[in-house]
Amino acid sequence: MERWSINDSAKIYNLNNWGGDLFSINKKGNICVHPSPNSKYSIELASLVDDLIKRKIKPPILLRFMNILEGRIASINRVFRNAIQTNNYPAQYQTFYPIKVNQQRQVVEAIANFGKKYNIGLEVGSKPELVAAISISTNNSLPIICNGYKDTEFIETVLYATKIGYNITIVIEKLFELEKVIELSRKTGITPKLGIRVKLSSKGTGKWATSGGEDAKFGLRISEIITAIDLLKQYNLIDSVKLLHSHIGSQVTKIDKIKNALIEGARIYVEMKKLGVNLEYIDIGGGLGVDYDGSKSSYFSSVNYSVEEYANDVIYQIKNICDEAGVDCPNIISESGRATVAHYSVMVTNILNTNTQNQMPDFESILTQAEPLSPTVRKLVDIYKSIDRHSLREDYHDTLQLIQEAVSLFNLGYLNLNDRAMAEWLYTRIIKKINNLVEKMKPVPEELQNFKLSMRQTYFANFSLFQSIPDSWAIDQLFPIMPIQRLGEKPDVIASIADITCDSDGEITSFVGENGRTKYLPLHKIRKNEEYYIGFFLIGAYQEILGDLHNLFGDTNAVHITFNKKTNYRIDTVISGDAIQQSLKYVQYDGNEILKKVRDSLENGVASKKISIEESSHFLELLDKTIQAYTYLGE
């Protein structure tokens, strides 16, 4: 038997490259989570999940590791502080969390609390987000930046909140917004705090590149900025403008694109200062990416730079332009939401079943039987018996032709169902035999390099792709996925992961592998009476809030966990996932009304003797219990 170690498992899932030293495999072959990079303290995920199940918290379970969240906030601020010291930068850095990345109250409150020492702020882009941010701001102390489209109600809310002491900046995205702000400021007599968003010609890279450039949805063109400055001077509001904002898109994969945007933004800052705008801040927006696949490349699921390089370039480029122009350096703001929250959240769920070939009928006897077989089946038997590495390529091509021939003959009525089943069984046996031979070949012939895909099985996991990791479906985003146990054993199956929705799109067929993106996930055969769990990692950004109710699968159970030196971990908060009753309510069904209608039908059934009173009572109890149950599958 081939020896296998936990290091081999770490390698095939590329764990050490995407894990950021926050995830490791222990000697038992189980995934562990660390509160900070290289910490000696850890939580074993498999044991944690077992403990949660004992507490009646069922999978799928979203695990939020609050120490990791705190550590990410500290890490981003630390690297900027170091960059400021290294470059002798004369101003400050400030983090703002864009709450659109994850608006869950417990998450935003935790970020605000962890970030107090760094004077962290919140960025909002809608009226609901504004109200949420105001509610989080204890003693009006939390700075808030308002981006996005704004109507009269939005602007008035900000103005009156400003009057009572809230620190809120309105960022002007369009000229009509500025006109509205001027009008409402004069009407209320309240002077606003203002910023201006510029539409840079520089673009980002990857899926969100269109957030930048001259065709971007938001921001003022250079000519519009000149108009805005004139308007602000005309109405004596020019001194209210303290911030220049730009954004070239989320998950910018190439550092050179970031540098270009920084240079352009800094030049605009310098020129606006020369025009009499007393700017104090540059808000460089988001874009700091996450290395989801661990490749450290410019592929859209990765980045070709570190957080340290990013911070150093931000500080250096802005300082260089300002020093050259003889202009005071601004305080710097970034809105790095993805990089802040991606790592702290892991979803774990159980595998329900597989479509493994082992469930096929056993036709072993046909390999030795002398009785007549159909010519197609007989040829497949001959290939299976004779195949070796010398005839591999020819036998592979012949096998593909024969299985297609079997389907055609069946459709024409020349093969019966049993013959077709025999052909399928032989095909899978031949493919397995070829796979064993291919694994020993060096080099592998070109047409056999993707051969493994024909061996791929489907593992059905207890989750909804559309609810828990919608970006995997919507934009083909890669997320690290791997088993959380048995990592001291060599995987003996390659698989795709299918969810439990009634949708053929609910399947993951792209994974993070040893050499980048791969079309299969190495897994282990399922053992009888033993749960097999997989983890979905780096899903803290956007996934919860973008998830939808496809097939009415609702929010999963969520658990907030902190590390504890005495007991290893502490469960701080448990947020129950949606019950069926809640999911039905979202689409205007009432659980009590449903029960009433069914009760009426049952009474009619009892009266007409279609069902007994005992059966009627049992069914009503069952339906009531079902309506109150978790939307995901149990036993």
Curated annotation (Swiss-Prot):
First-level EC class: lyase
E.C. designation(s): 4.1.1.19
Record key words, sorted: Decarboxylase, Lyase, Magnesium, Metal-binding, Polyamine biosynthesis, Pyridoxal phosphate, Spermidine biosynthesis
Residues recorded with modification N6-(pyridoxal phosphate)lysine: 100
Entry's Gene Ontology BP terms: arginine catabolic process; putrescine biosynthetic process from arginine; spermidine biosynthetic process
PROSITE patterns: ODR_DC_2_1, ODR_DC_2_2
A Pfam family annotated for this UniProt entry: Arg_decarb_HB
Pathway assigned in UniProt: Amine and polyamine biosynthesis; agmatine biosynthesis; agmatine from L-arginine: step 1/1
Gene Ontology molecular function, alphabetical: arginine decarboxylase activity; metal ion binding
Cofactor names: Mg(2+); pyridoxal 5'-phosphate
Protein residues bound to substrate: 282-292
InterPro entries recorded: Ala_racemase/Decarboxylase_C, Arg_decarb_HB, Arg_decarbox_C, Arg_decrbxlase, De-COase2_CS, De-COase2_N, De-COase2_pyr-phos_BS, Orn/DAP/Arg_de-COase
Biological role stated in the UniProt entry: Catalyzes the biosynthesis of agmatine from arginine.
Family recorded in the similarity comment: Belongs to the Orn/Lys/Arg decarboxylase class-II family. SpeA subfamily.
UniProt cross-references to HAMAP family, sorted A to Z: SpeA
NCBIfam families: PRK05354.1 (NF003763), speA (TIGR01273)
Protein name (record): Biosynthetic arginine decarboxylase
Species assigned in the record: Pelobacter propionicus (strain DSM 2379 / NBRC 103807 / OttBd1)
Phylogenetic lineage: Bacteria, Pseudomonadati, Thermodesulfobacteriota, Desulfuromonadia, Desulfuromonadales
